[in-house]
Every structure is written in C-alpha cells, then in structure tokens.
C-alpha cells in the first residue's frame, strides 16, 4: 500500500529500485524473511522521481522502469508496505542520522533497517554502514547488512558480475536484451501510444506501428532490429521491431521505434501498446 506513514512497526529497506532487478528482489526477500522471523510487517521506502532529477530538472536518468511500472513490479513481489517518499530539496539536506530519526523512526516506525551491500543515503551520501549502525543504536533502529547478490553471468572475462541498474543500462545500450532480461528476471519492455510516422514500411507491404514512449526518461535500447512481443487490447502478437534514425529517408536525427506486427493488418493508431523485448536479431534494418 502507498501510505504517508506505517500504522505499525516494520522491517524496511530503502532505495530507488530502478528496474526492480534480481539484486533488488534478493534484498527485498531478505526483508520479508527478517520481518516474518520478527513477527513484523515488511516495508520498503522508495522515491517516485529520481533524487538527482529533483535537484537538477535537466537530468535525464534513463529509467529502466517508470514510477508506475516500478510500483506494479514491487506490488507483485508482495511487501506489506511500499512507501513512496517525495524527495525534496529539504530531504536532500538531511544527514543520515536526521533521515533515520525523522523519517524512518518517527514517520515509518522502522524497527529493523536492512541496507543493501553498497547503498548509501543522507546528505552527499558521505556516511557508510558503520555510521548507520551507530545512529541506529542511538535512536532504536537495528541496522542489518544485506547479503550481496551476484549473477551467474559472464561479461567479457569477468564471471559472476554483480547485478546493478547501471549494469542493466549498459547491456541495453549495447542491445544485449537477453542478458538484461537475465539480470532483471523479466523481459525488458516499453509502453506507449501508436502514432503516425514515415509509414514507409506500409508502402512496401509491411504495415508498421510507430511507438511514442510514455515517459521521456525511459531508456530505449540500442538501435537495431529485435524480436518482440506486442501486447494491446488483452492480446499478444509476435513482432519485429526496428529502433533507429531514418537514414534511408532524409538522414535526419529523429530516432524512431517502429514495429511490424506479424500476421496483423489492422490500424492501431492511438492504441496503448507494450513492446516486450525477446532478442536482438541485427544492428539495424533499412526498409527502402
């Protein structure tokens, strides 16, 4: 539930949780297990807007999940409370001790705080785990270090790469949607509205739909051609997706997201659709 306060003491963790990836899920599972052992509710404290964007409106974080997508994924995991904290300039100035006292202790009734292995919070993120433990003892919060999560994937010659939102962004920028899905524990997706476009594919017998992504901060994977699932009106179809500029049209800078829905020939302009990435098939396709 999305609440301003928790009505009862809880075991909590805190973070932005962009992507709600495998590492996040491992951390949240530890929160749930500790809560069950202590007979308390589980909770996580997160932010609807990236903290850096609050401080700099020009910052574009390249989100793996929009706020709405993140809430939906977190709800599926099954924590008792998902606490959305509006990050403000005032909150950004709180020290870690002030944050723990004013928000975690007094507002959210946190009894146990589970900290991700590399997570920092507080003004300038200048303090670390040992500081949080000391503050917790002073104000009545037991601070627990979560076990680290490592993947079983190998990138280059490095095995067991730690899963992070930054790693997944890097993979998507390289078009590695299958590896990204392994780290996310679900296939990456884009939501948006079908809009008019060049429609060159339609002219040569391949009807295409151009997607306008809902959130301009959502990360778009690397240019290329992808096998995707296309979902709308409660049905799912196979599709081939082309992401890239239109070099065969006018060499313009506009980047397009254009999908050919296989064995489907109806107009779906203005429809809300979801594109779910399965695999990348090649770098880029020219349609004329």
PLM feature spans:
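Residue-level signal for inorganic ion chemistry
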Residues: 21, 74, 113, 180, ...
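Phosphate/ribose-recognition catalytic cores of enzymes acting on nucleotide-derived substrates
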Residues: 197-288
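Short acidic-hydrophobic, aromatic-tinged amphipathic segments that line or gate anion-handling sites
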Residues: 1-2, 83
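A glycine-rich helix N-cap at a beta->alpha junction
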Residues: 69-83
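Classical nucleotidyltransferase
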Residues: 93-207, 282-285
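Glycine-rich, highly charged phosphate/nucleotide-binding loops
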Residues: 62-70, 94-100
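N-terminal catalytic cores of NTP/NDP-binding nucleotidyl/phosphoryl-transfer enzymes
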Residues: 4-66
